[in-house]
Amino acid sequence: MKISIVITLGIAAVIAMAVIATIGSGLEQSSQSKIRVAFFPSIGHAVPIVGIENGIFEKGIGEQIQIETKLFDSGPQVIESIFASSIDVAYVGPGPVLNGFLKSHGKDIRILAGAASGGASFIIQPDSGLDSIENFDGKRIASPQISNSQDVSLRYYLASNDLKPVEKGGTVFVLNISNPDIYTLFAKGDIDGAWVPEPWATMLVQDLDGVRLFNEEKLWPNEEFASVLLIVRTDYLENNHELVQNWLKSHKETVAWINSNPDQSKSIFESFLKKHMGKSLPTKIIDESFSNLTITSDPIKNSVLTFAERADSLGYLGRTGYNLDGIFYQPDLNLNTMVKQLIG
């Protein structure tokens, strides 16, 4: 298996460019001899990176199965690729997953497992005054793409403290910009804070003297929430049930391997960046970033449902309510029942 990526970026952007790493054509319809996998070149997506790089997935699904990898920096882009049938399985945050499930009327996406919990933080400028909620008026706070997981969490946090973004008649400027641009604006002092995933959160702290006001898990019950999920396109699942089961098994094996071999996992991640992205990150950033998340196959269902409630309260899930029945894959569901669900 070979992964080829062409990229010319500085270190701040190297792990978030929406590049495509492809073996063969990504526009082809997938088959039982191929699986097309989407993930981000970031620490929260350590499972696909480590599992593919060290051969766990290749061994688990069979060497005769071709693995195509496609790298993104935006969850909504991944969901659109699911809709276009150019992706079979993907690692992505709960925000885009929920939107995609509802947009397809519950037909196109199933959550197979979790991949990471935590790994997002609210980072502020040391002189911003954002350590007190009373000082948020007029501040400029950034998060990645609108409706993505960090964006929902930031806006919900504001609402929980009786604050609104400017576009909703409030006093806080919420900027939805890419992680590399967040890094640049934070360096220039043009934003006061940012709600970002790892390793960007740690980069803002270690590179730019940002202050980690809190890790997002502090705002969740039991201090845990699903930040990365493994999802599958439902028609691919229907046509490749055994292959998907083998991928899921390999996914869980990779989670266990990472947790048993943290130092080796960090080295594999670092080598992945060097080999496929051209540059890596300082070891101290990788170490701290890994310490701020939990690699797990548990989708933490309650957190996904709570996330939906929060997104709905912000108006992200439509005006007529929402129904998440069937969003979680049930391995004991027989194929005939699954087909009936898919065709309505």
Protein language model features and the residues they cover:
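Short, low-complexity disordered leader/linker segments with a strong preference
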Residues: 1-34, 339-344
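Short, solvent-exposed loop/beta-turn-alpha elements that line the ligand-binding surface or hinge
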Residues: 58-65, 218-221, 291-299
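Conserved C-terminal helix/tail region of periplasmic/extracytoplasmic solute-binding proteins
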Residues: 309-344
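Stable alpha-helical elements in mature extracytoplasmic
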Residues: 44, 53, 74, 78, ...
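Pocket-lining segment of extracytoplasmic ligand-binding domains
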Residues: 105, 128, 167-171, 175, ...
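Short, glycine-/small- and polar/acidic-enriched structural segments
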Residues: 31-176, 192-198, 213
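Secondary-structure end/capping motifs
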Residues: 238-318
